[in-house]
Amino acid sequence: MKPLSPKTLEKMYAGLGISADTADLLHRYWLCFSNLYGVISVRDAWNVFRNYEGTGLLHKKDFLAFSGIVQREPGHPYAVIELKEAYAGETTEDPADRLIVNGRLIGSGYGKFALLYATVEKQAGKPYWLPERKEDLLANTEDRFFLSREGKEMVHFLSSLRTDGRYRNYEGKPEGTLLDLDGRPVAGKRLPEFALYTRSEQVDIEYFKSEAKKEGLRREYAKTALEKVLDRIFTDLQTGGVLPDRSPGMSMQILLDLLCGDLGVSLTKAQAERLIGLYAELNNRSRLWLNRGWRPDEMGRGRRPGLPERLSAGPGLKKLMEQDPGARAEFERRLADLGIVLEED
């Protein structure tokens, strides 16, 4: 919906009749809903709020009315959308059916809500994680995904990787020189030290005729190589990917293709094993949207919800395994931590 002016929003808040402190508390909760759950209905959000605040602080009708105000308020890292806006065929106008959606689940164009749909599907049947202390929930007013020990270790490891300055085809063969946003070679630089457009991003930019659209995409894609890799890991782990049957092996293959193919990083056996281990640990110890805030290691040591029992290695992983037979054993061990068996070819 179209954002409202500050003056109009001020009048709406005044009409709601709640104190500034209560409005501030609600904004904090909304940030936590977005960061912790990814997507949650206003109805369920009310139940979470009531679990910690009771019913004395705010009436449900005022909670619902607040959702309509913040829906038109610009500058938030989340959106409040009507159910019928996200799902064709829905006609409900009940404000309780609105969805609080983290902005990273909303794309553009035809697949605008693809990640939203995928996340909602994987959330089905799972309870929301509700910590005993309200303070532990409200600690999520900022995105904490890479602030954990496991997240920091992943960032540290990726930050140490260097590019050889060549992009590769799907067979891993060099095809050209990688250039940064200013057209300079990036060979020898670490991932945080250069920004570039990947080949798929370049295709996206060239697809549009509108210069305004092109410029918007250039700004959106103008991230360092490290940021692009972290974004990929974040999206894959939080949502499980767009495909309902996407496996950890497939996600790892896509990550390796990004590192090797688009960013010119050649991993040694030791580095590949380290990456696989960090990926598994980050997955197991993170509060994931697809689990409604639960960590996989809190949901039992059996097979993780939404993950397959078996998978086959893709071309990139097969190549790593062929270089050293021990790599396969290590990869199998890491997958076993997720309750997954690597199938024989």
What name fits each language-model region?
Residues 2-15, 19-21, 64-133:
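Charged low-complexity interaction tracts in eukaryotic proteins
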Residues 1-14, 329-345:
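N-terminal leader/presequence-like segments
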Residues 52-97, 254-257, 261-288:
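Charge-enriched amphipathic alpha-helical scaffolds
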Residues 39-50, 59-61:
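Short acidic, hydrophobic short linear motifs in intrinsically disordered regions
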Residues 16-20, 39, 57-60, 220, ...:
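Alpha-solenoid helical-repeat scaffolds
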Residues 131, 135-139, 143-342:
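Extended alpha-helical interaction scaffolds used for oligomerization/partner binding
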Residues 15-41:
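Positively charged, polyanion-binding regions of nucleic-acid-associated proteins
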Residues 24-28, 43, 61-64, 227, ...:
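Non-catalytic, well-ordered alpha-helical scaffold segments
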